[in-house]
A protein has these predicted regions:
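Outer-membrane beta-barrel translocator domains and adjoining extracellular loop/strand segments
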Residues: 1, 17, 25-32, 68-77, ...
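Short beta-alpha junctions and helix-cap segments that line functional grooves
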Residues: 103-105, 161, 274
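Membrane-embedded beta-barrel scaffold of Gram-negative outer-membrane proteins
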Residues: 110, 116-122, 126-132, 153-230, ...
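Residues that define the transmembrane beta-barrel architecture of outer-membrane proteins
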Residues: 37-41, 97-101, 156-160, 169, ...
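Outer-membrane beta-barrel domain signature
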Residues: 1, 30-34, 92-94, 149-153, ...
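Face-selective signature of the C-terminal outer-membrane beta-barrel domain
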Residues: 1-122, 174-177, 242-250, 257-259
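Gram-negative outer-membrane beta-barrel transporters
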Residues: 178-182, 198, 215-294
Length: 294
């Protein structure tokens, strides 16, 4: 990659060009995905300008992405499963060639000598990763039989945030609040969670579902999934909101300085139908104590 600085006296401007050619290959017993290749060409532009009482930051990025890979379909033969366990199913080859565009703008200003505020908006497109597209096999590290989808669309997220910064030398505080709407959010959904959602709408058929569940478990064993949870990469609109806060103070102590701080971050995420997005980090409290000797 290369970065070109085209700044002038009134603004900071940079152009970034980057090219990545990446091979993804998983070998051994845990070969849950066939070899895949990704080629990505990126060009980005960044501008930072002082508008008097406001500071403006703008960024734009264009990605041209090509992903190629294959998916081996499972072959099931109940009568001769042990006899032909090493045989491979039909292989389907895919080539995804697409582009994405992302844009971000932040406008900030000082309210007082110690307090600043900034408002930001970002629209980001993301093409599915090779794993999300071509995964198809047992992933022992997660205890799941994970299945990708070569027909996934790109994600598009729109984010609004507001940030406050305070610093008077000895004491500082930071708080940021955001809300993000994501179209076609890609998530790894456990099949049993999908069944649970259906059960909520068919409570009168609980016994029937239990019998089917046992039957499906037997089928999974026959298909070589063992006790692994079957999970699929799927898409659904989602909404994220949350905040990050941090504050701290420094003290002169002996021949050095003692810095104390506390931080907390919270993320809430729901799909459009009201169900929670899986695998979201729980709220965190972060405590820090650092002593620096002069």
């Amino acid at each position: 990659g290369a970065t070109f600085d085209i700044s002038n006296d009134s603004s900071t401007q940079k152009v970034v060009v980057n090219f990545v050619d990446e091979d993804n290959s998983i070998v051994g017993e845990e070969a849950f995905m066939n070899p895949a290749n990704s080629k990505e060409f990126t060009i980005g532009y960044y501008l930072s300008k002082d508008l008097g009482i406001y500071d403006l930051d703008v960024g734009f990025r264009h990605d041209q992405i090509e992903r190629s890979g294959s998916v081996t379909e499972e072959e099931h033969d109940d009568d001769h499963g042990d006899e032909h366990g090493d045989e491979h199913g039909e292989v389907d080859y895919y080539n995804i060639d697409d582009s994405t565009n992302s844009f971000a703008v932040t406008l900030g200003r000082s309210l007082t000598d110690n307090l600043g505020i900034s408002l930001g908006y970002a629209s980001v497109e993301r093409l599915p990763s090779s794993i999300e597209l071509f995964m198809n096999g047992p992933h022992m590290a997660t205890g799941r039989f994970e299945v990708g989808d070569p027909n996934l669309n790109s994600e598009t997220s729109n984010n609004f945030d507001i940030t406050f910064n305070f610093d008077n030398g000895d004491f500082y505080a930071y708080a940021s609040f955001y809300i993000t709407d994501v179209d076609n959010y890609i998530a790894l959904i456990d099949e049993e969670d999908d069944h649970m959602d259906e059960d909520e709408h068919h409570e009168d058929e609980d016994d029937h579902h239990e019998e089917e569940g046992e039957h499906h478990e037997d089928e999974h064993d026959d298909h070589g999934h063992g006790n692994l949870i079957h999970a699929n990469y799927m898409q659904e609109d989602a909404e994220f909101d949350g905040y990050e806060i941090e504050f701290g103070r420094s003290f002169d102590l002996g021949s050095g300085e003692l810095a104390l701080s506390f931080g907390r971050d919270v993320v809430n995420a729901e799909f459009a139908d009201g169900h929670y997005v899986p695998r979201i980090n729980p709220a965190r409290n972060i405590y820090s104590l650092v002593y620096t000797q002069d």
